[in-house]
Amino acid sequence: MQKEVESLFGAIETRIHSTLQRLPAPEGVVYACGFWLFYCDYTVLGVPCFAYNTVGNENDTKWSPSEWIVDVADEMTEVLKPLYEQVSSLMAGKDDAAWEALIEYQWNVYSKVCISLNASVKQGRGPLAHWYLTEDFVIGIFEEQADDDMYDFLVKASVGEKAALELGIV
């Protein structure tokens, strides 16, 4: 991956953390946050949506961010959009293989961010420390548009295989 792209994804990670810290605590107890709707048409890399849901609002959609109480947190999108525009500009004219490598790189970055955030939550610290969270809270990648194998892979990569199985996500 290009150094400039890696640097931008470092800035994306920093902005995710700072935005989570600034977001007001939702009413209720949050059991999950997730990134979903990762978009790429090989000319533009879109900002994935950030969502969360609270206990009592899960019904049949417990792991379906598009149905959660907050399916798109606009503040996260707005703060990440300029960085994603820069990534897309750096990728202009690249072939499909380069874009596919970028998509995989993005998933790896987001998986690592989620694993790190999950660890900080378990220790009672980090950018979500001001939210009311369940004991088994997770933040992960819940990419509903992916096929089942890719969905399962991304969930396990972002929340850990043990948590994914214990919570019945996969």
Predicted regions and their residues:
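Short N-terminal edge-element motif at the start of the domain
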Residues: 1-30
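N-terminal interaction modules that seed assembly of large macromolecular complexes
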Residues: 25-62
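Short, hydrophobic/proline-enriched secondary-structure or compact coil segments at domain edges
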Residues: 35, 110, 117, 136-143
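Sequence-level detector for tyrosine residue identity
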Residues: 31, 39-42, 52, 84, ...
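Polybasic, proline/glycine-rich intrinsically disordered low-complexity segments
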Residues: 53-122
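Soluble secreted/lumenal catalytic domains
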Residues: 41, 80, 117, 157-163
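Long, hydrophobic, amphipathic alpha-helical segments used as structural scaffolds
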Residues: 23, 27, 118-121, 125
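Glycine-rich, aromatic-bearing surface loops/beta-hairpins
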Residues: 126-170
